[in-house]
UniProtKB/Swiss-Prot annotation:
Catalyzed chemical reaction(s): tRNA(Asx) + L-aspartate + ATP = L-aspartyl-tRNA(Asx) + AMP + diphosphate
Gene Ontology MF, one: aspartate-tRNA(Asn) ligase activity
Lineage: Bacteria, Bacillati, Actinomycetota, Actinomycetes, Mycobacteriales
Binding site for ATP: 216-218, 225, 482, 534-537
Gene Ontology BP terms: aspartyl-tRNA aminoacylation
Protein name: Aspartate--tRNA(Asp/Asn) ligase
Record localization: Cytoplasm
Positions of L-aspartate binding: 170, 216, 448, 489
Family assignment from sequence similarity: Belongs to the class-II aminoacyl-tRNA synthetase family. Type 1 subfamily.
Organism whose genome encodes this protein: Mycolicibacterium gilvum (strain PYR-GCK)
Length: 590
């Protein structure tokens, strides 16, 4: 072995022992005729001192991030020199020999200083030597182990599903891989293991899980990755309560890795209530500021802006003192989200209403408004009007922004909820308008995905009354982040074909894209359901980090580029020829 102890393990009880450490030079300090280094490895840091002879002479060549092995005697630090900030702070190693295992070139950035993200990603192997990035990756491993432990205890089978499959319409663009042996044909990287895990239920596996890599070729979005990880689970012969209860066990074990005892069972809120009260299907419950319905209140208003299908409000406590420039900034906030602006009323200290909206209201509307919305003198009341979905989305975003500006969010709090009773379908036009992808060519598209089972009450009528149909779907939300989503699945061919038809997927297309699944359903498919957790997001929350890039060993930049390897990159003419990427498909090709 190149070392006998790890740097972070030394304690006063080890005094007098001869040890060999190996790691990196985190810092070097020259104190007259003595050189000190902080030697870092994965376990922590120990101070090493070079006092005399040849070993002191050798130490003069050490620089930051040299990889070294040191042998020496563990000693108690002189009085007054202890460092209470580190576990090894009471001891040091008096070096008797030094071996340089690897020299370091001049660093592109100092590891103990702030560096730009581009540099950090380009030299990610250096970035991961730092405490916070390195610990985030180690935490991820602990989280994986915690989840596996729970699932193993419930007789789950860990099964790997293919990462080279066929392209199916799942809501985002596929990454395509040319099939060299069938020129003109392509594999697709999976957006999720959805279809394969359902087939595993048909196969009688009953309890499946996988820490699965998924791929989606999406447009630039600030905190998305083209490849990401899910904890994917599926179970046969279960209802929604069974899936949610087991999911809660997994979450409790995962949050225990940071010392938090998650109280169970977790609360539940219906999709309709979440949208009505919080303007979001992933509500942040760490603070109040609920939306207030004002549609009926303004039913007879002469103010044209409020003559809309929906009018709602959210109150900003103390917001009446905002300067005009700040209030104008709220208009820009709304425009960035696709709205014309954000109406507001200021409540004076004497209760008088001012602002551009107030003058357009009737005396009766002004008289009762503060009581209706729950505002106090000194508050600002923001309004949105339009379709319920659009206006609530703006108010929900405003609610979050108000909470941030007023420092209402406890950063140490954990607020979980299940969102249940989801609509089975949404208008394809509304889905597209809000930035989602509408699968199929019909007027309606699946709210979750096409394989989500309707509730028993909606099964007979979902294709004649799609706007009222509910699905057996459930999302788990933590601190305003969707961290998992699942549902009971369709397991009958006739129901699945009706859903496809509802979405405008023709029988021919359904057979072409999903024929293997439809056929499987004819061989005694069991009722089944499952869930997929956004593993990157969960680990980021646990680590207290804002971006999922921080918890991925080698992430892509926001534009999907890897600064380290410079991927994606052009291919050679020979590779292009061999791949058959330019070949025209045969008669049976896609």
């Amino acid at each position: 072995m190149l070392r006998t102890r790890t740097a972070g393990s030394l304690r006063p009880a080890d005094a007098g022992q001869t040890v060999t450490l190996a790691g990196w030079v985190a810092r070097r300090r020259d104190h007259g005729g003595v050189i000190f280094i902080d030697l870092r490895d994965a376990s922590g840091v120990s101070q090493v001192v070079f006092r005399d002879g040849a070993v002191l002479e050798q130490a003069h060549r050490l620089r930051s991030e040299f990889c070294v092995a040191v042998t020496g005697v563990v000693e108690i630090r002189p009085e007054g020199n202890a460092n209470a900030d580190i576990p090894t702070g009471e001891v040091e190693v008096n070096a008797t020999s030094l071996t340089v295992l690897g020299e370091s070139a001049a660093l592109p950035f100092q590891l103990d200083e702030t560096a730009g993200e581009e540099a950090r990603l380009k030299y990610r192997y250096l970035d991961l030597r730092r405490e916070v990035p390195g610990n985030a990756i180690r935490l991820r491993s602990k989280v994986n182990a915690a989840a596996r432990g729970v699932l193993a205890g419930h007789d789950f089978v860990e099964i790997e599903t293919p990462t080279l499959t066929r392209s199916t319409p799942e809501g985002a663009r596929d990454f395509l891989v040319p099939a060299r042996l069938q020129p003109g044909s392509f594999y697709a990287l999976p957006q999720s293991p959805q279809l394969f895990k359902q087939l595993l239920m048909v196969a009688g596996m009953e309890r499946y899980y996988q820490i699965a890599r998924c791929y989606r070729d999406e447009d630039f979005r600030a905190d998305r990755q083209p490849e990401f990880t899910q904890l994917d689970m599926e179970m046969s012969f279960v209802d929604a309560d069974d899936v949610m209860a087991l999911s809660e066990e997994v979450l409790r074990a995962v949050w225990a890795t940071i010392g938090y005892d998650l109280p169970l069972p977790l609360p539940r809120i219906s999709y309709a209530d979440a949208m009505r009260r919080f303007g979001s299907d992933k509500p942040d419950l760490r603070f109040g500021l609920e939306l207030v319905e004002c549609t009926e209140y303004f039913a007879d208003t002469p103010f044209r802006v409020f003559q809309a299908p929906y009018v709602g409000a959210v109150v900003m406590p103390g917001g009446a003192s905002q300067p005009r420039r700040t209030l104008d900034g709220w208009q820009e906030f709304a425009k960035q989200r696709g709205h014309k602006g954000l109406a507001y009323v200021l409540v004076g200290k004497d209760g008088e209403l001012t602002g551009p909206v107030a003058k357009n209201l009737t005396d009766a509307e002004r008289a009762g408004l503060t009581a209706h919305v729950g505002a106090n003198p000194g508050d600002c009341v923001f309004f949105a009007a339009g379709t319920a979905k659009s206006a609530r989305a703006l108010l929900g975003a405003t609610r979050i922004e108000v909470a941030k500006r007023l420092d209402l969010i406890d950063p140490d709090a954990w607020a979980f909820t299940w969102v249940v009773d989801w609509p089975m379908f949404e208008s394809a036009a509304e889905a597209t308008a809000s930035g989602d992808v509408a699968v199929g060519s019909g007027a309606w598209t699946a709210m979750h995905h096409a394989f989500t089972a309707p509730t028993p009450e909606s099964e007979a009528t979902f294709d004649t009354d799609p706007g009222s149909a509910l699905s057996n779907a459930y999302d788990i939300v933590c601190n305003g982040n969707e961290i998992g989503g699942g549902s009971l699945r369709i397991h009958r061919r006739d129901v699945q074909e009706r859903v496809f038809a509802m979405m405008g997927i023709s029988q021919e297309e359904a057979e072409d894209k999903f024929g293997f699944l439809l056929e499987a359903f004819t061989f005694g498919a069991p009722p089944h359901g499952g869930i997929a957790f956004g593993w990157d997001r969960i680990v980021a929350l646990l680590a207290g980090l804002d971006s999922i890039r921080e918890v991925i060993a080698f992430p892509k930049s926001g534009g999907g580029v890897d600064p380290l390897t410079e991927a994606p990159a052009p291919i050679t003419a020979q590779q292009r020829k061999e791949s058959g990427i330019d070949a025209k498909p045969g008669k049976d090709g896609a």
